[in-house]
Amino acid sequence: MVYVSNKYLTMSEMKVNAQYILNYLSNNGWTKQAICGMLGNMQSESTINPGLWQNLDEGNTSLGFGLVQWTPASNYINWANNQGIPYKNMDSELKRIIWEVNNNAQWNNLRDMTFKEYIKSTKTPRELAMIFLASYERPANPNQPVRGDQAEYWYKNLSGGGGGGLQLAQFPMDIINITQGENGSFSHKGTLCIDFVGKTEKYPYYAPCDCTCVWRGDASAYLAWTSDKEVMCADGSVRYITWVNVHESPLPFDVGKKLKKGDLMGHTGIGGNVTGDHWHFNVIDGKEYQGWTKKPDSCLAGTELHIYDVFAVNNVEIINGNGYDWKTSDWQDGDGGDGGDDNENNKTKDLITLLLSDALHGWKA
């Protein structure tokens, strides 16, 4: 999840949003230095909050709004409306910034660097924060070295760059046809398990991300899997996930089997306690298989997640989605990264004055 509201964000909330922005823009070709230079400015402008109105004056479109405090807000809002996308939305605002890069908008080349050159630059985050301040934000007070400090902070305390290999969790089957939903009266009472059928018996489903088989239950015909890394979920959250596929027989893999995203993972089936060919699916937060529990029917022990919040349904045919909020995503899988620098998180207290940034004092673009 990301934080979108008309309030000043806390440190922990800003970090969630900043990490999302880093991941998103890395996968669109930006360097980590350029992203963090912009984040140093966003922190002062909006506390990295896409829902923030200048001075908390919600609806005053003559003032600033959003991550970079577009002023007047109506310029950005009208653009979003013309694009048919929600304006108070993280992805929409990042799309606007990418549009500005591609259309040479908003940027005044005051530091001998174009916007397209900026997003590819490997200058220091501090230098790039000052360039972004001068050429993009152009506030009433241009003397704000704190934005450079903030840019350096984000560079040192966010993980990844170039996407860090972050993959979108893709729904495993190419169709959605539900025969029993969450809290189903037949065998899902109290659980978030869902049963799916294919277009034929023994219908295939595929690995939603790079993953490893961590448990095999022959008597009940199930395999448990964990993601090898954190994944981007359909609801925008980044987390490890663990799930079970139930009813294929015989089971096709042993514990320790590794699959790449898109590899064949299994088929619908009639193994275990079953009344017809289908696939029973259940997912929890985290990377540890903890066995099963009863709620009162059986499900994975741990924090269950809604399948429709975890797995994006890009290019999936929905025949019967049971009315659930299935989501597509614009996320593009990362292709690696430098692993970031996570060893300076203890400096948070030293930077608390930075986090009470001049966004609280009304600076605006």
Curated annotation (Swiss-Prot):
Gene3D superfamilies: 1.10.530.10, Glucose Permease (Domain IIA) (2.70.70.10). Keywords: Antimicrobial, Bacteriolytic enzyme, Cell wall biogenesis/degradation, Degradation of host cell envelope components during virus entry, Degradation of host peptidoglycans during virus entry, Glycosidase, Hydrolase, Late protein, Metal-binding, Metalloprotease, Multifunctional enzyme, Protease, Viral release from host cell, Viral tail assembly, Virion, Virus entry into host cell, Zinc. Residues 166-365 are annotated as: Probable metalloendopeptidase. GO terms for molecular function: hydrolase activity, acting on glycosyl bonds; metal ion binding; metallopeptidase activity. It comes from the Viruses. Its main location: virion. It is found in: Virion. Its EC number is 3.2.1.-, 3.4.-.-. In the N-terminal section; belongs to the glycosyl hydrolase 24 family. This is Morphogenesis protein 1. The lineage of its organism: Viruses, Duplodnaviria, Heunggongvirae, Uroviricota, Caudoviricetes.
